[in-house]
Design a protein with these regions (language model features):
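Catalytic-core regions of hydrolytic enzymes
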Residues: 1-46
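Extracytoplasmic/secreted cell-surface and envelope-processing proteins
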Residues: 1-4, 27-32, 49, 72-76, ...
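Active-site-adjacent substrate-binding region
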Residues: 41-68
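Extracytoplasmic/secreted envelope proteins and their assembly/folding machinery
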Residues: 3-7, 34-35, 45-52, 96, ...
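Sec-exported extracytoplasmic/periplasmic mature domains
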Residues: 11-15, 52-60, 104, 113, ...
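Short catalytic/ligand-gating loop segments at beta-alpha or beta-beta junctions
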Residues: 59-76, 127-132
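His/Asp/Glu-rich mid-to-C-terminal helical/loop segments that flank catalytic regions of hydrolases
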Residues: 93-132
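Active-site-proximal beta-strand/loop segments in catalytic clefts of secreted hydrolases
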Residues: 20-25, 40-42, 69-70, 86-93
Length: 132
């Protein structure tokens, strides 16, 4: 499925939030470590902050950073928040071993979900304040 088809599918199905999850690669196998989050529009920065915050609570996970104004194809959609999560580097043997562990992957995704829940709560609070 092309990126455009994926975007159309999101819009057609009235997606509220899109989180694109990947493994990072590149750099030196010993120097490139950690998880990172990316957003294109500042209005979605808090979603990436919430997700990254929970991922940083995991033992042995380094912070590779949070990048704003990041231009990836899916983030071009402005109808709903869309962010990218790079879990760990598959080009690092130590991180590849972590990613091979199903329990570790599950814990990572549970932390992504916790960040999403926090973001939704923040949106509801902001929405309630806007109505006052």
């Amino acid at each position: 499925m092309s990126i455009r088809e994926r975007q159309d599918k999101f819009i057609e199905n009235k997606v509220d939030i899109a989180i694109s999850i990947h493994c990072n690669a590149g750099g030196g196998p010993l120097s490139s470590l950690g998880t990172s989050t990316y957003y294109r529009y500042n209005v979605y920065k808090s979603l990436t902050e919430d997700i990254l915050g929970y991922l940083m609570q995991m033992e042995g996970v380094n912070n590779f950073g949070m990048v704003g104004n990041f231009n990836f194809s899916l983030s071009a959609i402005t109808d709903f928040p869309c962010v990218l999560v790079e879990t760990l580097f598959i080009s690092s043997l130590a991180e590849e071993e972590k990613l091979a562990d199903a329990q570790f992957r599950r814990a990572m995704m549970e932390n992504v979900a916790k960040g999403l829940v926090d973001y939704i709560k923040e949106c509801r609070v902001a929405e309630g304040q806007a109505k006052k």
